[in-house]
A protein has these predicted regions:
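Structural motif at the C-terminus of the N-lobe alphaC helix and the adjacent alphaC-beta4 loop
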Residues: 10-19
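Conserved structural core of kinase catalytic domains
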Residues: 23-71
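Catalytic-loop of the protein kinase fold
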Residues: 90-110
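Conserved catalytic-loop aspartate of Hanks-type protein kinases
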Residues: 163
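Conserved C-terminal C-lobe helix
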Residues: 212-226
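A conserved short helix/loop substructure at the end of the activation segment
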Residues: 226-238
């Protein structure tokens, strides 16, 4: 408990100059005081229901039916904000930081509706190998839950690419309003983990790709983040670049037709 709180406070303190991170006000022992945000988190808005449903109950024969009320533009905007915040950790100038627990619930809304990043108690500040001139991979212990990358369930050495995989799961929630493997509820957690270990990825209705420009971009990004081999996944900086370019294109289209 002490180490979790210490890490949460340490990472929060390092980013006090970034107003997109929840601001730490104080820390002592196993307690941390941070700014109060009353607008809820992204998970409750993106996955408004249970997030689990049987395929037949979607009634989507004629068209896909996202289970949230986000517009395509909002989905792209939130995905970009999430990516920028994760990238800030990975690109920290004094050493790469892995969040280690990327979920939609870690992104809180401020008064203006922008996202603020939160909850760094599982963060890992990666060590640097002078001989190899690279960051050292580390072990987390066997992963729990269903938001993790395949290598975590095998307890293999991991790096920041576990955050990339979990970011893809967050994008899935934005896109569909559902959890990955939405037909398997929490009682089937082991079954979900076995699917991920085998390299299976959640079903993405192909109609999402052509539903809108924004959603097509998100499908492409999601599929890239779910590469089984972590070395084949894009880094967060390249994802931020792609999302920013997509948002510029989206804004240009809106301006042209307004």
């Amino acid at each position: 408990m002490f180490e979790f709180t210490r890490m949460d406070a340490l990472v929060s303190e390092r980013f006090t100059s970034n107003n997109r991170f929840v601001d730490i006000l104080g820390h002592c022992g196993v307690s941390m005081l941070s700014e109060y945000l009353s607008k809820g988190n992204l998970e409750k808005a993106a996955v408004a229901g249970s997030g689990f449903i049987k395929q037949a109950d979607l009634h989507d024969q004629d068209d896909v039916k996202p289970q949230n009320k986000f517009s395509a533009a909002a989905k792209l905007s939130y995905a970009l904000q999430m990516a920028e915040l994760i990238a800030a950790l990975h690109d920290y100038p004094h050493g790469k930081i892995v969040h280690n627990d990327i979920q939609l619930s870690q992104f809180l809304f401020d008064q203006s509706g922008m996202l603020k990043f939160n909850d760094f108690n599982r963060a890992e500040i990666m060590l640097w190998d002078e001989q190899k001139q690279d960051y050292c991979r580390y072990r987390n212990g066997p992963g729990g839950g269903n938001n993790r990358a395949p290598e975590e369930y095998y307890d293999k050495p991991v790096n920041e690419k576990i955050d990339v995989f979990s970011f893809g799961n967050g994008v899935y929630g934005l896109l569909t309003g559902l959890w990955p493997f939405y037909e398997l509820d929490e009682d089937h957690e082991t079954e979900m983990q076995e699917k991920l270990k085998r390299g299976e990825t959640p079903f993405v209705d192909p109609r999402y790709h052509n539903r809108s420009f924004e959603e097509g971009i998100l499908v492409d990004i999601m599929n890239a983040t779910w590469a089984y081999d972590p070395d084949d996944r894009p880094d967060m900086i390249s994802l931020v670049t792609k999302l920013r370019l997509a948002k510029l294109e989206m804004d240009k289209h809106v301006s042209k037709h307004s």
